[in-house]
């Protein structure tokens, strides 16, 4: 979703005195609609809100959606992400006032989606759960289990869609899962992470890669980097989500197998798992890392990541290190 389109939408809403913004599409369309709704009553440049993260002084226009791509979960979330192509920045913004007033989710609308969009959507919704699941918060048994069950449901039905994009029941499960993944039910009472999203946004901003594809590269690399300090939650993930046998083996071996199975799942869907597949040059890692921390400082919750950490994670996404 790009800023010039948002500006045009704001102009049209003001010109015609519109009272509601209806988004018919996927996450990019819905996020654009939210930005338009935010900008119509705002005095000044709506991009300033994305930079400052300040809550709006005036109520945004109501937003409603007809979902055509289950992925971002924007149809039930209070969040929006916009790309400023001029400054090559991709930033998010959130306000309870941006949660859609209603959303229509009909699985039959997904039958014509290209396979690539299906795969990207699966990666995105899984990442929304990962950002909540991997936490330092203790005594989260119920929400742990809800996260794990939703991840297993997504993977099971993604494999069905991998062979048949017209399976109504599989799409229904995926659409409901994508909704649950990002309406924050799974994040209640948990310190959340959002490091992978912050790092991936720089890939999308600089190289215009698909968000889901970028996450399929960044997420396993991040897991490899932070898991040695947080073995318990990553063993739990490997056993309860990826089906690794929970034996008395060295925890690091269980974790490695869990991450390896996640990468194989991504590749099964045709997603990239290396920076090379995205044609991203290591020479841009320093710039992207600096950009990732430029607004709010170090990223992440489970582990705070500075510029040096982020560059190391980007390097772990390179095949020559990944398969060494």
Locate predicted features:
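Acidic, glycine-rich active-site loops and adjacent beta-strand->loop/helix elements
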Residues: 1, 28, 38-39, 68-71, ...
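N-terminal small/polar loop signature for handling phosphorylated ligands or for N-terminal nucleophile
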Residues: 1-44, 160-171
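A glycine/threonine-rich phosphate-anchoring loop and its flanking beta-alpha core
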Residues: 41-139, 236
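Active-site segments that bind and position negatively charged phosphate/pyrophosphate groups
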Residues: 132, 136-261
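C-terminal charged capping/lid subdomain of soluble metabolic enzymes
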Residues: 234, 241, 245-324
């Amino acid at each position: 979703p790009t800023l010039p389109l948002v500006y045009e939408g704001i102009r049209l809403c003001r010109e015609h005195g519109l009272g509601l913004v209806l988004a018919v599409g996927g996450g990019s369309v819905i996020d654009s609609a939210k930005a338009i709704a935010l900008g119509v009553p705002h005095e000044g440049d709506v991009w300033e809100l994305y930079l400052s993260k300040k809550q709006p002084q005036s109520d945004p226009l109501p937003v409603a959606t007809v979902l055509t791509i289950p992925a971002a979960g924007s149809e039930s979330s209070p969040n929006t992400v916009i790309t400023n192509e001029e400054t090559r920045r991709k930033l998010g913004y959130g306000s309870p006032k941006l949660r859609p007033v209603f959303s229509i989710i009909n699985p039959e609308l997904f039958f014509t989606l290209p396979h690539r969009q299906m795969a990207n959507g699966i990666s995105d919704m899984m990442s929304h759960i990962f950002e909540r699941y991997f936490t330092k918060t203790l005594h989260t048994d119920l929400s742990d289990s809800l996260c794990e069950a939703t991840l297993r449901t997504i993977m099971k039905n993604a494999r069905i869609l991998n062979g048949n994009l017209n399976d109504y029941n599989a799409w229904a499960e995926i659409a409901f899962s994508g909704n649950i993944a990002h309406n924050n039910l799974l994040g209640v009472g948990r310190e959340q992470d959002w490091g992978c999203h912050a790092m991936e946004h720089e890939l999308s901003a600089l190289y215009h890669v698909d968000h889901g594809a970028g996450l399929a590269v960044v997420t396993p690399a991040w897991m490899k980097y932070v898991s040695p300090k947080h073995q318990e939650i990553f063993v739990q993930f490997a056993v309860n989500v990826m089906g690794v046998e929970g034996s008395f083996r060295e925890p690091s071996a269980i974790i490695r197998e869990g991450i390896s199975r996640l990468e194989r799942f991504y590749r099964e869907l045709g997603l990239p798992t290396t920076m090379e597949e995205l044609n991203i040059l290591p020479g841009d890692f320093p710039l992207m890392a600096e950009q990732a921390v430029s607004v709010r400082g170090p990223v992440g919750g489970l582990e705070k990541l500075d510029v040096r950490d982020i560059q190391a994670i980007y390097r772990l996404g390179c095949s020559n290190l990944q398969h060494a």
